[in-house]
């Protein structure tokens, strides 16, 4: 029987007071009964708008219909045809601005909880599936993938399903890219990422860690000396941006990238860590995206008494996912919106002791269509903080550009590609943050999927 409730089933979660002191996953996931009930809210539209909002084009109505019938493994098989990372996507994709944002049920009520259902199905499969993954028959062609983030994993998975011999080259000691070094355990457990990677390995994908492409091996060497017929660059965007204001070199100033990498990958909060993070009482995180929310919530879990999100626009302009903002508010993060830093203050030891700011007000729209923040006269203030984390986005590392002859990039470092993901170098494709700069996991996955199709077509035409 259809469920015509205007509200989606709420996601069970840890209590905010409890979770703000641990790194366990905040959202605990739907039960079977909740998932089936939520799936019955889907109208199974003849022209499903939700699918047009999905970067990897999952057949959403079909998988949800199968959930409603309690055919969870069949639902998983529908999802996995389009997405190599369903357990990841169900947790971190911005569904409210993609598939769920176009759901018809959202016109007069809340949209169907597509992301939560995708997560449920993937988790159910990981817990209950008994049949081993069938390894596709090899087609005899080799492809290299640079980077093991969402773009690289998706490209590798799609190519492996087509029979390609795929090797992923990862610079760090763990595979997963931003999924493991950038997103905290409480939002995306590392065990979930590892299970997704294990699934790709079962398809025949090889993963080589501690391989810095551009240093260990160049792109040209992969093709000319190692026999790869095509290369996909999905190396992400790990070069942090700063404001270039006075005081950014003080002790206690971090990029969000460094702060999160130390916590997520190196466990820098442990007393015996070789890359320790100074525990702070009052922390300011500059920025308003998902990464800023992650950094702020990590600082809180490390024992900070006050954590501020400092953002130059208003609450309604925050680019972070609605759920992440709500979780941060529930945990006690303080939002200082319409506020912009002008200087970081230091004491006699060169350590952060405050941050000068000015209040902002919204003026006329800028090129992005959002109202441009302008300084409010005579509005200077000082925040009493001993740590500042800059979360202002990232750009691609220039190493691959510098070591790949003929590779064209934008002035800010993004690799230039065509609609198939092809770069200016024959047989070399790229996608994800290495092309766009900081973007979402799902958009990176979509780019990896596009490039995989382009690589397949390229190699077929070479035969």
Regions found by a protein language model. Give the residues of each.
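Ferredoxin-type iron-sulfur electron-transfer modules in oxidoreductases and energy-metabolism complexes
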Residues: 19-37, 59-91, 108-135, 263-264
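Local cysteine-cluster metal-coordination motifs and their immediate loop/turn environment
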Residues: 40-59, 84-107
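Feature captures the FAD/FMN-dependent oxidoreductase FAD-binding
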Residues: 74, 137, 142-146, 194-245, ...
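Glycine-rich dinucleotide-binding loop and its adjacent helix/turn
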Residues: 121-137, 195-215, 240-302, 409-424
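N-terminal Rossmann-like FAD-binding beta1-loop-alpha1 element of flavoenzymes
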Residues: 141-167, 292-300
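Rossmann-like dinucleotide-binding cores of NAD(P)H-dependent redox enzymes
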Residues: 165-168, 172-202, 207, 296-343, ...
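FAD-site-proximal beta/loop scaffold in flavoenzymes
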Residues: 249-280, 365-438
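A conserved FAD-binding loop/helix module that cradles the flavin
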Residues: 434-462
